[in-house]
């Protein structure tokens, strides 16, 4: 691919990634340091990071959404464990509400980041739609996560190439995959498997088998009615705790 060079864009802060970390950093920068300029470089076409990448059946948060979401933009949905679609909607709405989306450069693949001690600046080189983009800033924030977006981890099982069926990694779930009535084996019992397997079973899979190496504890999903009660109770409990704390100290 031919890359066309371009001029350098100077900002105070360069943020890599438009997922939870990148959006959170962008908000805190403007909240605590008004007037600070920044740019968010996102390789994908959408906001969300991992939550835009993972599209397998049943994808959802594997922890309480109240701890996953931003403290400055509380979650208002009824569920305590949110599905991937609602999380993406939340991230997009939040970025738009606070104007963060205006600072995001999509389809921008960072190729290098170099520190210059002579002027204390970072120079980031990226490809954006066939054009080389250069960004220079005093601070560089990596919100790029720890996944290999190009290829999910796949163990080298002997005989895998002799298997005649479909081999699918949840990280790159085909939109047109037809598993209706099929026998499916899921290797692993982590968060992905726990969310994937019930969704497969409920949406037409013939039989689903999970292969598990190490036993894990699994609890039932929180009930929506209980979640609403706890949320309303939290408004009462927290002030009481503050009063007791202030009186004790």
Where are these regions (language model features)?
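Glycine-rich active-site loop/strand segments that organize a redox cofactor
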Residues: 48-90, 215-249
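Feature captures the FAD/FMN-dependent oxidoreductase FAD-binding
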Residues: 79-148
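Conserved N-terminal glycine/acidic-rich loop preference
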Residues: 2-26, 43-75, 94
């Amino acid at each position: 691919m031919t890359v066309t060079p371009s001029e350098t864009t100077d900002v105070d802060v360069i943020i890599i990634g438009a997922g939870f970390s990148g959006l959170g950093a962008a908000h805190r920068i403007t909240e605590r340091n008004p007037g600070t300029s920044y740019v968010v470089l996102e390789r994908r076409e959408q906001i969300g990071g991992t939550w835009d990448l993972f599209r397998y059946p049943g994808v959802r948060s594997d922890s309480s959404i109240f701890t996953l979401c931003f403290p400055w933009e509380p979650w208002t949905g009824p569920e305590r464990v949110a599905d991937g679609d609602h999380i993406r909607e939340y991230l997009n709405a939040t970025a738009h509400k606070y104007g963060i989306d205006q600072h995001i450069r999509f389809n921008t693949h960072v190729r290098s980041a170099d520190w210059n001690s002579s002027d204390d600046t970072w120079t980031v080189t990226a490809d954006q739609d066939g054009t080389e983009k250069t960004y220079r800033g005093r601070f560089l924030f990596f919100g790029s996560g720890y996944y290999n977006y190009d290829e999910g981890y796949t163990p080298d099982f002997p005989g895998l190439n002799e298997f005649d069926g479909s081999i699918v990694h949840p990280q790159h779930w085909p939109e047109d995959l037809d598993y209706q009535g099929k026998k499916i084996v899921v290797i692993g019992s982590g968060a992905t498997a726990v969310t994937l397997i019930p969704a497969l079973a409920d949406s037409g899979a013939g039989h689903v088998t999970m292969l598990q190496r190490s036993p894990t504890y699994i609890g039932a999903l929180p009930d929506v009615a209980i979640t609403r009660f706890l949320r309303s109770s939290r408004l009462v409990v927290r002030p009481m705790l503050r009063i007791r704390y202030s009186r004790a100290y």
